[in-house]
Amino acid sequence: MQIYKVGGAVRDRLLGRPVSDIDWLVVGASVEEMHAKGFRPVGADFPVFLHPKTGEEYALARTERKSGRGYGGFTFHASPEVTLEEDLIRRDLTINAMAEDDQGNVLDPFHGRADLEQRLLRHVSPAFAEDPLRVLRVARFAARYAPLGFRVADETLELMKQIAASGELQALTAERSWKEIERALMEDEPQVFINVLSDCAALKQLMPELEGDAAALAALTQAAEHHQPLHIRWACLLHNLKPASIKALNQRFKAPRECQELAMLVGECASNGHRALQLEPEDMLALLQKFDVYRRPQRFEDFISVCQMVARGSGQAYPQADYLRAAAAAARAVEAKPLVEAGLTGQALGEALRHQRLEALKAYKANAEN
């Protein structure tokens, strides 16, 4: 039995990046031997075990064969006879197909180290084209390592084009696709993810609504530079679309509720946000009510953040941000307690609250214009 570190842990150590998770590969062992040593099986599709002391995952070396469509269309074979090289050759990129033994020696049968030095994302073998999820994974790696100068190798981009043309991308589940999209959006240069998908003709199949949308990429770039959370980045990416298209993308990838809600609100309300300084008090009140700003003030603040990222993406300042925040504060300063104490309830209470909030917004607008 031989145990190796593999994949990202080896890659990131050689790049001088922090290593968070370690993938362990076991060569020359059977399932029975792993059980005998106290390892606990957890893999549903292929033999993966948890270390009895550390809880880390250890996978038996395996081969794979294409047996159906999509990410899950593979048959796996694990046995003590599977060699290290046979396991590594099934991996996606050469930089992910290196192993490290217990002496710290790097085993590199597919020249991943050279590709690290040349800053290339290159596929290991033609079998790369059998897994459509790899199109998204490579685009995500391109986004992650763009700050280090990495690019997708020309021949790998050609294979990605072949996958896109094959129709296999349609076999990807919403959950698997979103997992890659989510991780890519949280990289330092997420716009590279979209650009690579466009370069290999995958974007027009997965997210055709975004094809050629430079404003979306500019806003997303700003969101990343300002370290915004996922739901703000997603809303920035979709901000230039009509609500129907936003809804379609949300549903296509089953985006989390927070992402869906903010993206839809931006699509429906951004034009009023941009016109904030010209809005009549009645329209401002309607905008604040749309966001339920009295009970969910953070959602309105997130909306303002998206609008700011959009403006910065086009090289503009956004004085509307302070105006919107102050208007919200003026409306929220109106309290229901005095009205309740005066005996108002139900519809009468609601109408009185609305009237006082409207008066507060009128006073704020008049003061801001003087």
From Swiss-Prot:
The keyword tRNA processing applies. One of its GO terms (molecular function) is tRNA binding. Coiled coil: none annotated. NCBIfam families: PRK10885.1 (NF008137). This is CCA-adding enzyme. InterPro entries: CCA_bact, NT_sf, PolA_pol_head_dom, PolyA_RNA-bd, tRNA_CCA-adding_enzyme. CTP binds at G8, R11, R91, R137, R140. It comes from the Bacteria. Keywords: ATP-binding, Magnesium, Metal-binding, Nucleotide-binding, Nucleotidyltransferase, RNA repair, RNA-binding, Transferase, tRNA processing. The keyword Transferase applies. It comes from Pseudomonas putida (strain W619). Its EC number is 2.7.7.72. Its cofactor is Mg(2+). ATP binds at G8, R11, R91, R137, R140. It catalyses: a tRNA precursor + 2 CTP + ATP = a tRNA with a 3' CCA end + 3 diphosphate; a tRNA with a 3' CCA end + 2 CTP + ATP = a tRNA with a 3' CCACCA end + 3 diphosphate. Catalyzes the addition and repair of the essential 3'-terminal CCA sequence in tRNAs without using a nucleic acid template. Adds these three nucleotides in the order of C, C, and A to the tRNA nucleotide-73, using CTP and ATP as substrates and producing inorganic pyrophosphate. tRNA 3'-terminal CCA addition is required both for tRNA processing and repair. Also involved in tRNA surveillance by mediating tandem CCA addition to generate a CCACCA at the 3' terminus of unstable tRNAs. While stable tRNAs receive only 3'-terminal CCA, unstable tRNAs are marked with CCACCA and rapidly degraded. It is an enzyme of class 2 (transferase). Gene3D superfamilies: Beta Polymerase, domain 2, cca-adding enzyme, domain 2. Mg(2+) binds at D21, D23. A single active site specifically recognizes both ATP and CTP and is responsible for their addition. CDD domains: NT_ClassII-CCAase. One of its GO terms (biological process) is RNA repair. Belongs to the tRNA nucleotidyltransferase/poly(A) polymerase family. Bacterial CCA-adding enzyme type 2 subfamily.
